[in-house]
């Protein structure tokens, strides 16, 4: 294996691990872990819900997640293309949120399916998100 191929493989592995850490950070309410996948100046666009910094998105979504009984973020197909110290990825994500019981003892399950379209860069010895666009392909309430 060439050095370039090995470097690309290591980059893809680091990026995939970061995607997993992001989901785990949100699901386990570990804010530092969720922050860790973003560069300080990273930006985020979550369809019509949020536009701003990556850390700002984590802060914004924290309030929503804290008000839910449970939440689950699961990633699936992930295509990562590395170009030197930058990369792009498209990752399918399923997000399931369960509301707390309402006064009638009912609970809602919110399911969203979409894609993370990420721009990554390698800075200060780590791969992190420079920009993310979340595309919501469908959402259902049960």
Region roles according to the model:
Residues 31-96:
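A solvent-exposed, acidic/Ser-Thr-rich amphipathic alpha-helical stretch
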Residues 73-75, 111-116:
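Short, surface-exposed coil-to-beta transition loops
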Residues 95-99, 120:
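Beta-strand elements of well-folded, non-transmembrane domains
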């Amino acid at each position: 294996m060439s050095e370039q191929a090995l470097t690309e493989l290591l980059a893809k592995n680091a990026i995939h691990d970061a995607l997993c850490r992001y989901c785990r950070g949100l699901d386990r309410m570990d804010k530092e872990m969720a922050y860790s996948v973003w560069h300080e100046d990273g930006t985020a666009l979550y369809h019509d819900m949020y536009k701003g910094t990556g850390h700002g998105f984590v802060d914004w979504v924290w309030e929503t997640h804290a008000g839910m009984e449970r939440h689950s973020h699961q990633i699936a197909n992930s295509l990562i293309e590395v170009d030197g110290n930058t990369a792009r990825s498209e990752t399918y994500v399923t997000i399931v949120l369960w509301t707390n019981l309402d006064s009638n003892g009912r609970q809602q399950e919110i399911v969203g399916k979409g894609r993370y379209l990420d721009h990554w860069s390698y800075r200060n010895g780590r791969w992190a998100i420079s920009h993310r666009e979340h595309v919501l392909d469908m959402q259902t309430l049960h």
